[in-house]
Regions:
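N-terminal helical cap/lid subdomain that shapes the substrate entry/recognition surface
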Residues: 1-60
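Asp-based, Mg2+/Mn2+-dependent phosphohydrolase catalytic module
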Residues: 39, 63, 67, 78-184
Length: 184
């Protein structure tokens, strides 16, 4: 609950990325009445990021979908995550060769849903919104941001009700994206 709240505050621009890095564990500990020193918070955060970068669980159907997409489309990653973490996760999960570019907060200093990060990604990919499709799991960060810049959007949400965004397709399984793109 507390981790989701601090990330919500980051997306709402109530706090900075630096604040998140420095305060996330202090915030959680304060919620249970424990004060944490800066040194301990830094150590816990460093260990957390190292552990997080080694977590490489793939959603069912990921490899099959990527194998279908790569011959037909140029793929890029647009993430609010830390660049070092995203690249390590991609390397460890075997996904690195599927994607041409990785655009993160660290590389452009803005976060989704800000239009600047979408525009930076499209510039790097040398493409236009009309020729771009954002597939994401966050209505607020991924879908709203993509639609705002004129991209098409697909909301991946296995357990959610149908999207209230009529312009965004909603899929519950990655195989649905393959069917959608191949016209099945």
């Amino acid at each position: 609950v507390h981790n989701r709240e601090i990330w919500r505050r980051l997306e709402a621009k109530e706090i900075t990325h630096d604040y998140l890095r420095e305060e996330r564990f202090k915030y959680i500990m304060r919620a249970i009445g424990v004060e944490m020193s800066n040194e301990l918070s830094d150590a816990v955060n460093t260990q957390f990021l190292d552990t997080l970068s080694n977590y490489t669980h793939l959603i069912d159907g990921t490899i099959e979908l990527l194998d279908f997409l790569v011959p037909n489309y140029e793929l890029h990653i647009l993430s609010n995550g830390l660049d070092l973490i995203q690249r390590k996760k991609m390397q460890l999960s075997g996904l690195g060769n599927y994607f041409k570019n990785v655009v993160t907060f660290d590389t452009v200093q803005v976060r989704k849903p800000d239009r600047e990060i979408f525009e930076a990604a499209m510039n790097l990919a040398n493409t236009t919104p009309e020729n771009s499709l954002m597939v994401g799991d966050s209505i607020d960060a991924d879908i709203k941001g993509a639609l705002e810049v004129g991209m098409q959007a697909v909301w991946y949400a296995p357990n959610a009700e149908i999207s209230s965004y009529a312009e965004a397709h909603h899929i519950r399984h990655l195989s649905e994206l393959k069917s959608m793109l191949s016209g099945e």
